[in-house]
């Protein structure tokens, strides 16, 4: 009996001695299982709005800023398919009901823990003006994803894009996804991209540095700028985007070609007519994924 007690006493001493090490090993294994084997959590909900906290604001100009909103966990992702957008909602003084508008983040699911919105504040823009009133720590109501466009690698051979002003945001999302998935980066996307980007003044060209960096590193992406009020010595287009510019700088109509449009309504309307006159399939009032001319 005494031998049994002695043996158990020795065993207890061993357990006490090595217990901290066992706890540490278990903790490490648990952490590995949580961070190494689990997929990032997608937080968007298409059926209900959720509140996200503004964590950072970066002013780009007097009326343009990038708003960074935190996701609940640093490992969370928005869960937004490439080509889709989100709805923002706010109660605005003087409006009879909640105002809802669509925006495309300039960040992607490759960046965890937050999402970025590039917003230009228009005098008549309810949501854009509302965003300028937000302070760090304030919340914004967001729902999604939504939209008919879901980009997949090599869905067509060549994409032509026409963007005006903040209409560059869905284009940038797709451009970055294509370049990120090039063969040299371990992917398989060989889609060519040509972009016509229209603005009023040269200083209005949003995300210009990022766009030109992408064009410099990728020979499958080209940009043609168009300005209403070009400065002296400007070597891009001037005035409004014309059918002649589209013919010169975008891919010709073909089954494996898609044209994407996003910008102010008058511009999009004019571009629908211009593309149709050049032989592209007539754009529908509400675009579908399979359309040759797709309007965001």
From Swiss-Prot:
Residue span, FAD-binding FR-type domain: 47-152
Any GO CC annotation of this UniProt entry: mitochondrial outer membrane
Keyword set includes Metal-binding: no
Free-text function comment from the UniProt entry: NADH-dependent reductase for dph3 and cytochrome b5. Required for the first step of diphthamide biosynthesis, a post-translational modification of histidine which occurs in elongation factor 2. Dph1 and dph2 transfer a 3-amino-3-carboxypropyl (ACP) group from S-adenosyl-L-methionine (SAM) to a histidine residue, the reaction is assisted by a reduction system comprising dph3 and a NADH-dependent reductase, predominantly cbr1. By reducing dph3, also involved in the formation of the tRNA wobble base modification mcm5s 2U (5-methoxycarbonylmethyl-2-thiouridine), mediated by the elongator complex.
Coiled-coil ranges (or none): none
Cofactor(s) the protein requires to work: FAD
InterPro entries: CBR-like (IPR001834), Cbr1-like_FAD-bd_dom (IPR008333), FAD-bd_FR_type (IPR017927), Flavoprot_Pyr_Nucl_cyt_Rdtase (IPR001709), FNR_nucleotide-bd (IPR039261), OxRdtase_FAD/NAD-bd (IPR001433), Riboflavin_synthase-like_b-brl (IPR017938)
Subunit structure: Monomer. Component of the 2-(3-amino-3-carboxypropyl)histidine synthase complex composed of dph1, dph2, dph3 and a NADH-dependent reductase, predominantly cbr1.
Gene coding for it: cbr1
Organism per entry: Aspergillus terreus (strain NIH 2624 / FGSC A1156)
Record-annotated membrane-spanning stretches: 11-31
Topology within the bilayer: Single-pass membrane protein
Subcellular location: Mitochondrion outer membrane
Stated name of the protein: NADH-cytochrome b5 reductase 1
